[in-house]
């Protein structure tokens, strides 16, 4: 009779996953600091990246070193932002955001993932028009809906979405209003469980059977690439068992 993974094996897998997540956060901190300076109070993108690091139990020392490398105080690698677009099986649109120090390597890895899973890469803008860029501040169930809604709208949010199935609430903002809305809500004692600027599809596409399997395989393969920061798609997540 076969045996399941050992405790050590599961720990190693967990450590590897955590290490990969830390690498992505450090790259985001590096690019944000290089673009907007090393002071998070004057750099909303850097503050968001650092908040993500803190919520993942990354030490402040690690983040500070990443900032210093980006601002030239310490020697470090320079990363650039690149975005790729394409289609997964079933006509599912996919956006892949990367931070890389080697574009040739990154595009080859991304193209290989699309090709191996039955998809294809497109040109710039080929699928981006199917998505909206927006800020999302997520709150767990239990927060007072009226209080949050009033504070969010007053702070400049575009919309407040309540999910009746679990009571969670999302506050939606324009990207350039994200920082001011977040700061206003935090100042009012309304701390989001998660906050980010992201892409959301205008409409979801349902897939099933082998197509769903291939779409999931592609998304997982892309997310596992070292240079990939975020992967967005317009697939109906319920179809993938998410």
UniProtKB/Swiss-Prot annotation:
It comes from the Bacteria. One of its GO terms (cellular component) is cytosol. It is found in: Cytoplasm. One of its GO terms (biological process) is regulation of DNA-templated transcription. Keywords: Cytoplasm, DNA-binding, Transcription, Transcription regulation. GO terms for molecular function: DNA binding. Pfam families: TACO1_YebC_N, Transcrip_reg. SUPFAM superfamilies: YebC-like. Belongs to the TACO1 family. NCBIfam families: PRK00110.1 (NF001030), PRK12378.1 (NF009044), YebC/PmpR family DNA-binding transcriptional regulator (TIGR01033). This is Probable transcriptional regulatory protein XCV3282.
């Amino acid at each position: 009779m076969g045996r399941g993974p050992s405790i050590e094996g599961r720990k190693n897998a967990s450590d590897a996953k955590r290490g990969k997540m830390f690498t992505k956060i450090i790259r985001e901190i590096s690019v944000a600091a290089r673009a907007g300076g090393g002071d998070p109070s004057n750099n909303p993108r850097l503050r968001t990246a650092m908040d993500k690091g803190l919520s993942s139990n990354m030490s402040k020392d690690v983040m500070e070193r990443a900032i210093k490398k980006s601002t030239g105080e310490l020697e470090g690698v320079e990363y650039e932002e690149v975005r790729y677009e394409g289609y997964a099986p079933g006509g599912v649109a996919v956006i892949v955001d990367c931070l890389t120090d080697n574009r040739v390597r990154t595009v080859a890895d991304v193209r290989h993932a699309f090709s191996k899973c039955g998809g294809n890469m497109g040109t710039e803008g080929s699928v981006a028009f199917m998505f909206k860029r927006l800020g999302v501040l997520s709150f767990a169930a239990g927060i007072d809906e009226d209080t949050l809604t009033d504070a969010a709208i007053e702070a400049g949010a575009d919309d407040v979405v309540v999910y009746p199935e679990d009571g969670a609430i999302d506050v939606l903002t324009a990207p350039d209003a994200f920082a001011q809305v977040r700061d206003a809500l935090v100042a009012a004692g309304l701390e989001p469980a998660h906050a980010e600027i992201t892409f959301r599809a205008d409409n979801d596409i349902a897939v099933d059977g082998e197509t769903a399997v291939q779409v999931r395989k592609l998304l997982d393969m892309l997310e596992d690439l070292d240079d990939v920061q975020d992967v967005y798609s317009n697939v109906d997540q319920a179809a993938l068992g998410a």
